[in-house]
Amino acid sequence: MPVTSSSQPTTGYNYDTFADDLRKLVLQLELNDFVLAGFSMGGGEVARYMGRFGSKGVTHAVFISSVPPFLLKTADNPEGVEGAIFEGIQDAVAYDRYAFFTGFFQNFYNTDLLLGKRVSEQAVQASWNIAAGASATASLACVPTWHEDFRKDLARVDVPTLVIHGDADRIVPIAASGQRTASLIPGAHLVVVKDGPHCITWTHAEEVNRALKAFLGAGHVKQARRKAG
């Protein structure tokens, strides 16, 4: 029978597994000269893939509203978010994930400002429906992955890189993520979307697509930065 949805395993909700799964797909499809682009948690997968497997075959990397480099506040990462915030999220998901999703998607789209202007009630509801249909195990297990430390992974990113982030992102604040990611990758280009929430791929799709087209169509040469250095 054809597979119409993803499986819902009880283990493997970590970035090493995500990156390994992506690597298997790359090898199976014999991909070469491809772009790795990730949104939100997906940006962490891009970083971990590069950290584990390098850039062979990868021409560009794109991070959109992404969680790297390291969201957790620690002694050597004072720019991060207090751990109690993530613990509170886990507690809320465990107690009533459906109620949590309602508040989450309000901040995902900044509905208090953008509902009826850049996002419809139906689009927000569709996102809630998708989240509600996800594995309860995955919904809970993914929260700690939000504050994975990707700093060593980003150090291995040696391809032209684009970072796109909204300056009004309430889920993954730009100051703790996008701005720092761009500063850690030599030559990375940062595009800040004015008034953009977390889901700029929906609310500000035109701006995101324009940035992607300009970046990917610019004819960047993978080795250019290495030679320049």
PLM features: residue spans?
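Glycine-rich phosphate-binding loop signature in dinucleotide/nucleotide-binding domains
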Residues: 26-32, 157, 215, 219
